[in-house]
Amino acid sequence: MWKPNEAGAASTLNTTAGDYALFVDALLNGKGLKPETLREMETPQVAIDPACRICTKQEPKELSKNLFWGLGWGIQRNDGRDALWHWGDNGSFKAFVMAEPKSKSGVVMFTNSQKGLEVAKPVVDEAMGEESLMFDWVK
């Protein structure tokens, strides 16, 4: 397995889908974090501009009423349900995770394909029982 020489904010997480699922399970069940820390992570901090993924040089055109960033997680609000989500993109490897704290359910998906996120939406929608709103933005 490739191992980076230095840790970074992106692209240096090396794990398996099973181990990452254990991490998500611990998060959903409040293990390893103070309750107030977990609440803060799950609270929308910034609304997403659906028209712009990397918006450092322009003002937002419109802010989403359903997609936000919490602390370290994307947050989707859909029909009164909040779900946490995140994705990884290392070129030819893609990953996606979605978890719903209220129902304590989630899905972790790792692929070894540049087109891995193309199959993620139907898998995530089926597993979570709701439409995933962020895939148009993630692309």
Q: Which positions does each model-derived feature cover?
A:
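Catalytic loop of the DD-peptidase/beta-lactamase superfamily, centered on the K-T-G motif
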Residues: 1-139
